[in-house]
Amino acid sequence: MSKVLIVGGGAAGMFASIFAAKNGNEVHVFEKNEKLGKKLFITGKGRCNVTNACDVDELFQNMVSNEKFMYSSFYGFTNQDVMDFFENAGLRLKTERGNRVFPQSDHSSDVIRTLELEMKRNGVHIHLYSNVEKVVAEDGRFSYLVMADGSKEEGDACIIATGGVSYQTTGSTGDGYRFAEAMGHKITEPAPSLVPMNVREEYIPALMGLSLRNVQATVYDGKKELYSDFGEMLFTHFGVSGPLIISASAYVGKILQKKHELKLVIDLKPALSEEQLDARVLREFDANHNKQFKNAVTGLFPAKLLPVMIHLSGIDPEKKVNVITKEERMNFVHLIKHFTVTLTGLRDFKEAIITRGGVKVKEVNPSTMESKLVQGLYFAGEVLDLDALTGGFNLQIAGSTAYAAGSNIW
């Protein structure tokens, strides 16, 4: 039996404590907040998307960084294992669009409560308001924690599960990176991911609140396509957000961080080819041939988007439809298929769902999450240089890495 000290009482820390305790270890969780699972409480808009019910192979496809590192842990504790864990603990689950798995109650508090009950059932010692200042190793092995009040907590093993630096109001302030660096670990520079993006065009605030459904969004660096997907997006006072944009940020964030502008091209009518769309526009023009242009195209766009599209078309809004040239019409059709804005940067960590970057995984054993540099030191969750798309995949990473760490300490 080992004395296991876990730094951080978020998803990864809670999971890891349960698995370590099931092995018969004496387990202590140190959480600096007044309660456990503070970030979990707000995930999935307060509903907590616990995992994704896709095939296990698809878990890797939805990872953005270091998916090969997760091979052992994803298969060691699969998405089905996560679902079984909660169901066996008494939490009923449901699967929604995109295979997203939520508690039937739609309350993240029920997920946290279930994890807490399992911790208590397995004898985990929970220490709230417990701020760890240092993680100390001696002779290449974990030795003790130094608390904020100067006291020491000795143990045989330590799992760092402090999360990243997104949603800092929940206590995610990057402590784990500092602890890891102090023991010789290299850190991939943390950056916001799954985050809205800023746009340069000055008409963007006029579109604030406009949601576009069933559009194709493609991000280009010059002529090089970086990301493309179909779905829903939202305009804000600063730029763009919504599911498509949040996912895109995971792929294009590194380039935007280098102060490099990118083009976001939105196909407003992806179900139609340019020829089919031209035929549709022609029908609108024929039906309204005596109307002014601004009044003839109201059926093509949401009301908020209409003045912007008319302005960008370069066609006089007062012009009668029956005198619009073929060239003007074709340019208008092209605009509908290629509505383009300039991405200038990511929003900051306060708005990021997760953190990209963290403890370099080359220095961590992928089967056990133990440090290759310090014996008895383990990592779990977002503190590692691992990130994935939305849909329950990041919580699956938390669960799988926590299982690998906790279940391998005896």
In which residue ranges do the predicted regions lie?
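An anion/pyrophosphate-binding glycine-rich loop and adjacent beta-alpha core
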Residues: 34-36, 41-42, 50, 56-57, ...
